Amino acid sequence: MAHVVVLGAGLGGSIMAYELQQQLRSEDRITVVTRDPTYHFVPSNPWVAVGWRTRSHISADLTPTMQRLGIAFRTVPATRLVPAENRVELADGSALDYDYLVVATGPELAFDEIEGFGPEGHTQSICHVDHAEAAHAAFERFCENPGPIVVGAAQGASCFGPAYEFAFILDAALRRRKIRDRVPMTFVTSEPYIGHLGLDGVGDTKGLLESALRSRHIKWITSARISRVEAGMMHVEEVAEGGATKPHALPFGYAMMLPAFRGVKAVSGIDGLSNPRGFTLVDPHQRNPAFPNIFAVGVCVAIPPMGVTPVPVGVPKTGFMIESMVTATAHNIGALVRGKEPDEVATWNAVCLADFGDRGIAFIAQPQIPPRNVNWSAEGRWVHFAKIAFEKYFLRKVKLGTAEPLYEWAAMKMLGIDKLKAARKG
């Protein structure tokens, strides 16, 4: 009998538990360790921040689902991983031994790397539903006395899509309130160009996003490095290819900036397991090279940047890409418990819907990291409605405890979008 422990119950961790339950033997055990028993659909946080959703709209209690599936569910944070002893230490003083471990912790948010940055400083965040609720309260106060808005992503950030989404959603929300004419907006990003997205673009994301910003009268600064944030003022350096800098002092009445990520403390600083930023190192099978009974999925996985840029830019880990990591990991652990070697490799394909409040952009990147077999993007009102439908669908899937319904698998196969590279062999 094997015991598999999953650290985290977000997008990667919850679906990981469901897929393991399908791939393991009946005698094997699964334990999920998480700080929060409630799953929050993070892609809807921009809507929460303008009052178009509430916490209850985007949440699912995982406890009854895990119980029904026979998955042990520990709602206590992990404090330290001891891989040499196959043990996870928990905040309540207890510990869990494991045969196999899946790190699905998500990231730690590095607000502290910039003075005055983040919810405890002078900028808002939409990384967590708690942040989104605080951002909404601040937005309501802002609307009583409108002024300039600054939105974007800081140096080292890897998740740029939600920053663009939130800029456009704010634009739509302000127009609905008929105060958009009183709000100058600036988009500030560490990307070397608009639409880079940490991926050197997907299809014509550069043209599509530049056009969307222009048509909404949103100015932008690229290759931006934030030096500090004060109350009502953001200090930014625009960095040229040769290293020359141009300073900007941007006044704001409301600011939302996405931070850089790093690995959580419980799995950081472990030789052979994590890189200097605390992200977990994996091979093509999602397996850690130093500790072969440890796997990792999601934002916590170490992926090198696309290349050298004037300001550091990370690579995003998008939803479908994470699901492909999960599927490969579940199959590979299933093989190991049966005495076989892992042979499945995730495709890391990306299928993304970016909502603009009334329109949106969709893109498919196969694989997410270039060079690609498919490199497509499109814009239209249909994307806004597709994002709403996907929110409802995914939350239902989480509540039911289903990793991939048959009709989802069939639809993706029809579109030629696979989670496993092995699925295309032969």
Tell where the protein language model's regions lie, with residue ranges:
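Beta1-alpha1 glycine-rich phosphate/pyrophosphate-binding loop at the start
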Residues: A2-A72, Q155-L199, M414
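Internal hydrophobic alpha-helix adjacent to the cofactor/substrate pocket in enzyme cavities
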Residues: F320-T347
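A Rossmann-like FAD-binding core segment of flavoenzymes
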Residues: R29, R68-A84, V88, L96, ...
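FAD-binding core/adjacent interface of flavoenzyme oxidoreductases
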Residues: R68-E165, I169-K178, T245, M256
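FAD-site-proximal beta/loop scaffold in flavoenzymes
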Residues: A110, G118-N145, P251-Y254, L258-S324
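C-terminal auxiliary extensions adjacent to catalytic cores
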Residues: F363-G426
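Flavin (FAD/FMN) cofactor-binding core of flavoprotein oxidoreductases
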Residues: V345-I364
